[in-house]
C-alpha cells in the first residue's frame, strides 16, 4: 500500500509517525502481539479504506526497542525530591533484572489517584546473574547519575538483597529514607496468620482436590481459580470469593432441592451432586467469614496507600476507614490494628508537608504487562526485548515517536544488548541445537 501524503516518513525509516504510533499503540495499549499488529493494521486499513502502509512485525519490534531505549536514556531532571520504586524481575536462567522507576515528589498525582505507568520514568534496567546487597548498592549509586541527586525515598518489598542494598546506600546518603511496600507487608501479615494454620492447610487441600475432581465434569463451571505460584498471600481474594459463592450455592441447593437452571435447555446439577463434590466447604463457613474479613481489611489498607500515599495523617485516615467497615470480628480488628501501626511507622519517616508513594504495585503491574508483551518468549530468558520495558512507560504520540527514533538508533539497541545481556539463554539454546543437528 502507498504511504499517506499527510504522514511523511521519519528520516530514512520509510514510515511516518502516524503509522509507527498506530503500531506501537496496538501493541502497548491494545495488547496486540508484535506479530498480530501488522495484521490488525491491514484489517483496519482495508475496512476503513485508509490505504495504510503496513510494516513487517520485525520492523515494528525495532521501533518498540528504540522507544524503550529512548526512555532508558532520556535526560531526567536533576532534583533532590525523587522517589524510586525498585524490584527484581525473574525469568528462566540465572539472570534477574533490577528495575528502578522514579517520579519526583512534586509530580505525584493528587491524593485519591493511584500512580499510573505513564507517571513514571525509567531510571535503570539492569540484568545480572547475581544481586547481592553490595551489588544492589552499586546499582543504586550508578542510578544517582541519572537523577543528579540521591533520591529522597526508595520504595521496595523488603527482599533481603534489596533492603540490604538500600541500607548500605543510606550509609552514604543520610537524606534517603526507605518505605516498605504496603501490599507486601499486608501479605506477610496474612502469611503469619495462615501459613501454619491447620484449618487453612485443610482448606487448601480441599481446594486442590476439588479442582482435580470437578474440572472435567458437569461441575466444571465451579472449578476453583488456580493459585498463584508466587506471592500466594498477595492474591487470596479470588480464591476466597470463589469459596463464598460456592458455599452460598451449596446452601441454596439444599434449601431448594435443586438449583434454578442457567437456561431453559439445561438444568444444573442436583443438590446431592453438589454436596458430594463441594459440600465439604460448609465445614469452613466460620473460617471463611474470618478469612474474608482479613482480606477485606488488607484490600482497604492497600487501596488507601495506593491512592493517598504516605504522609503525616495517613495512619489516622486508615483507622477511620477501618472504623467504617461493618461488624469486623475480633481477629479482623487485630489485623486492622497491626496495619494502622505499620502505617504510623511509615509516616514517621516523612517530613511535614511531604508525601511519598507507599507501594510498588504500579511496578508489579509493569512486570505483568511486560510478560504479556513477551508472551512465550519469557520462557527463553531475557533478550533484546527487555528494552521494550521502557516503552511501557511512554506516552505514545507522534511527537514522542519522532523524538525517540531520532535519538535512539538500531546500533544503540545492539550495543546495549551486547553489554547488558551478553549471550542470552535463547542464543545458547539456538547454538546448542544447531551443533547437535550438525553432529547428527
Language-model regions, residue ranges each:
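Acidic/histidine-rich catalytic cores and adjacent linkers
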Residues: 149, 159-169, 208-440
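A catalytic-pocket lid/entrance helix-loop region that shapes and gates access to the active site
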Residues: 196-208
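Short alpha-helical "patches" and their helix-cap loops
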Residues: 38-44, 382-387
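Enriched - but not universal
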Residues: 38, 60, 66, 85, ...
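RNase H-like nuclease fold core
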Residues: 3-15, 19-25, 29, 34-36, ...
Amino acid at each position: 500500500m502507498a504511504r499517506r501524503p499527510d504522514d511523511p516518513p521519519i528520516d530514512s525509516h520509510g514510515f511516518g509517525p502516524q503509522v509507527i504510533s498506530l503500531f506501537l499503540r496496538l501493541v502497548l495499549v491494545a495488547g496486540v502481539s508484535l506479530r498480530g499488529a501488522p495484521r490488525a493494521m491491514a484489517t483496519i486499513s482495508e475496512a476503513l479504506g485508509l490505504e495504510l502502509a503496513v510494516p513487517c512485525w520485525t520492523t515494528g519490534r525495532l521501533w518498540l526497542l528504540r522507544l524503550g531505549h529512548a526512555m532508558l536514556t532520556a535526560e531526567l531532571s536533576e532534583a533532590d525530591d525523587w522517589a524510586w520504586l525498585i524490584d527484581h524481575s525473574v525469568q528462566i536462567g540465572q539472570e534477574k533484572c533490577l528495575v528502578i522507576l522514579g517520579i519526583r515528589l512534586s509530580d505525584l498525582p493528587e491524593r485519591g489517584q493511584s500512580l499510573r505507568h505513564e507517571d513514571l520514568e525509567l531510571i535503570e534496567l539492569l540484568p545480572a546473574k547475581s544481586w547481592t546487597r553490595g551489588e544492589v548498592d552499586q546499582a543504586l549509586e550508578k542510578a544517582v547519575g541519572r537523577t543528579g541527586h540521591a533520591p529522597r525515598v526508595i520504595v521496595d518489598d523488603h527482599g533481603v538483597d534489596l533492603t540490604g542494598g538500600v541500607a548500605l546506600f543510606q550509609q552514604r546518603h543520610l537524606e534517603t529514607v526507605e518505605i516498605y511496600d504496603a501490599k507486601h507487608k499486608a501479605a506477610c501479615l496474612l502469611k503469619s496468620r495462615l501459613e501454619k494454620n491447620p484449618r487453612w492447610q485443610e482448606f487448601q487441600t480441599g481446594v486442590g482436590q476439588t479442582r482435580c475432581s470437578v474440572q472435567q465434569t458437569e461441575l466444571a463451571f465451579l472449578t476453583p481459580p488456580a493459585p498463584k505460584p508466587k506471592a500466594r498471600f498477595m492474591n487470596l481474594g479470588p480464591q476466597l470469593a470463589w469459596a463464598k459463592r460456592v458455599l452460598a450455592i451449596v446452601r441454596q441447593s439444599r434449601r431448594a432441592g435443586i438449583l434454578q437452571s442457567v437456561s431453559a435447555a439445561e438444568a444444573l446439577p442436583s443438590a446431592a451432586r453438589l454436596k458430594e463434590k463441594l459440600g465439604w466447604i460448609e465445614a469452613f463457613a466460620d473460617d471463611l467469614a474470618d478469612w474474608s474479613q482479613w482480606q477485606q481489611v488488607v484490600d482497604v489498607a492497600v487501596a488507601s496507600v495506593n491512592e493517598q500515599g504516605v504522609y503525616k495523617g495517613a495512619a489516622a485516615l486508615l483507622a477511620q476507614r477501618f472504623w467504617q467497615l461493618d461488624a469486623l470480628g475480633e481477629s479482623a480488628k487485630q489485623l486492622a490494628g497491626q496495619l494502622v501501626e505499620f502505617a504510623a511507622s511509615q509516616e514517621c519517616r516523612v517530613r511535614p508537608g511531604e508525601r511519598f508513594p507507599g507501594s510498588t504495585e504500579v511496578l508489579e503491574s509493569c512486570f505483568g504487562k511486560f510478560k504479556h508483551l513477551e508472551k512465550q518468549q519469557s520462557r527463553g530468558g531475557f533478550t533484546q526485548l527487555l528494552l521494550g520495558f521502557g516503552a511501557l512507560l511512554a506516552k505514545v504520540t507522534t511527537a514522542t515517536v519522532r523524538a525517540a527514533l531520532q535519538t535512539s538508533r538500531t546500533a544503540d539497541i545492539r550495543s546495549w544488548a551486547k553489554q547488558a545481556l551478553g549471550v542470552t539463554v535463547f542464543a545458547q539454546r539456538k547454538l546448542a541445537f544447531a551443533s547437535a543437528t550438525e553432529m547428527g
